[in-house]
Every structure is written in C-alpha cells, then in structure tokens.
C-alpha cells in the first residue's frame, strides 16, 4: 500500500518504511541489475554515529534502500503499524534475503571487524543458510584501511552480494567511496551487530542496548524541539 511505502526521517536520515515483502521485491530487482545497489539496515548506533557527519549523510541519501534495523527507530518516527514494527523487530527482510542467497547458491563476500565476528558470521551461515557460497571474508578496520586491496579482492570473486557488518561511519564511508568501482550486485550494510547471532553472553549486550535506546530517545526529543 502507498501508506507503507513512504519515507520517514529520523535524525536527518530518510528511511524507507517498507514491508519485508516490498523490500524483498526491491532487493530481487537489484540482484538482476549490473550496477551495485546499496541496501543499508540502519541501527540506533549507526544513526547516532552519523549524527555529525553532514557530508556522509548526503552520500547516504544516494543509497538505494534504507531500512530500519530496529523497532525503536520506527517508534521514533511515530510509526504504529503493527506489521511494520513486528517485521522490523524480527528482522524479517534480512532473513528472507539470506534465505534467498542460500536457495540460489549466491556468491557472498563478508566484511567484519574482527576474527571472532567473522567466525560467528560464518557459523551463522553454516547453521541457518547452508547453500550460500561464502567466497571471501575480509577484516576491515578504520585505522589501516586498504580500500584498493579490498575492492580488488571482491572484484576477483564474481560476487553477488557483499555483506558488511562494520560499524558506522566506516561502513557508510567505505561503500560511498567505492561503489563505482565495485563489481557486485548488492552491498548489504548490516552494521556492527547486524547478523542475528545466537545470543551468548547477552547480559552486557542487553544493558548496553537499553542505555543506547535512552540516549537515542533524548536525541530524538532534541531534534523534535529543533523542528526537524
């Protein structure tokens, strides 16, 4: 429906308020196109990190599909539609897309920030999305970025999808700067905690999430007072 497909703005970033099915239709079209399309699942963390990055925010406007990675973001935009909130909370689109990659034996390249995250991500595919061809994995750090080497590695593997689980603004900078030279169908930015990993040691994570939400809500209040 038209109402579902409208853009919402949260902390100056336009987000596509799509159902999982609508987002999936877009993603499937991207997989048929020769140019790399950029899908980003924004999280509270990424919105906060991008707060001061005015130039980067402009670049992000050029991404093809920007979806809310958690329900709090939709709530901040006063979205009350239960289906949208539930699908966002359940990561329905991400699961649909990963299932599609597995079913079609797509070639996927993983970007992570640590060895441990790489192992977790790889394990997640082994367990839930068998059939996906993981053709490469790279550890990317903001300190010693080697974009050329990374792009060459990706371009050498006939990649269908680059899955990025990097923190902001590293993730957004990386794709904004290199999308014109990258050979892949889809870049999917998941953010640092993007892959729904089986929860181990959830304590710290939960508390961290709680504080993050509080800070985020304060930021939203401030931006409402400023009138944007």
Go through each PLM region and give its residues:
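Proline-aspartate-enriched helix->loop->beta-strand connector
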Residues: 154, 158-168, 184
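A short, gly/pro- and small-residue-rich
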Residues: 56-62, 172-194
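Short, flexible loop segments at boundaries between secondary-structure elements
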Residues: 140-145, 183-214
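N-terminal nucleotide/polyanion-binding subdomain common to many enzyme families
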Residues: 2-86
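Short glycine-rich anion-binding loops that position phosphate/pyrophosphate groups of nucleotides
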Residues: 44-47, 166-170, 193
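A charged, well-structured terminal subsegment
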Residues: 214-228
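Conserved beta-alpha
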Residues: 73-146, 153, 157
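Short gly/pro/ser/thr-enriched loop/turn and capping motifs at secondary-structure boundaries
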Residues: 73-75, 170-171, 193-198
């Amino acid at each position: 429906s038209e109402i579902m497909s409208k853009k919402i703005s949260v902390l100056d970033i336009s987000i596509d308020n799509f159902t999982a099915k609508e987002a999936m239709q877009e993603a499937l079209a991207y997989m048929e196109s020769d140019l790399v399309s950029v899908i980003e699942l924004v999280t509270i963390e990424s919105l906060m990190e991008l707060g001061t990055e005015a130039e980067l925010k402009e670049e992000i406007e050029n991404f093809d599909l920007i979806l809310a990675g958690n329900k709090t973001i939709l709530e901040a935009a006063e979205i009350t539609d239960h289906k949208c909130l539930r699908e966002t909370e359940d990561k329905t689109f991400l699961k649909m897309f990963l299932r599609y990659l597995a079913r079609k034996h797509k070639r996927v390249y993983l970007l992570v920030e640590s060895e441990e995250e790489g192992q977790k991500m790889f394990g997640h595919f082994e367990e839930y999305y068998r059939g996906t061809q993981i053709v490469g994995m790279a550890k990317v750090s903001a300190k010693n970025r080697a974009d050329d080497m990374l792009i060459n590695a990706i371009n050498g593997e006939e990649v269908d999808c680059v899955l990025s689980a990097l923190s902001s603004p590293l993730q957004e900078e990386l794709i904004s700067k290199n999308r014109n030279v990258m050979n892949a169908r889809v870049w999917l930015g998941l953010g640092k905690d993007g892959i729904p990993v089986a929860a181990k040691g959830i304590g710290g994570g939960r508390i961290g999430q709680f504080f993050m939400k509080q800070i985020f809500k304060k930021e939203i209040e401030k931006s409402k007072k400023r009138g944007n």
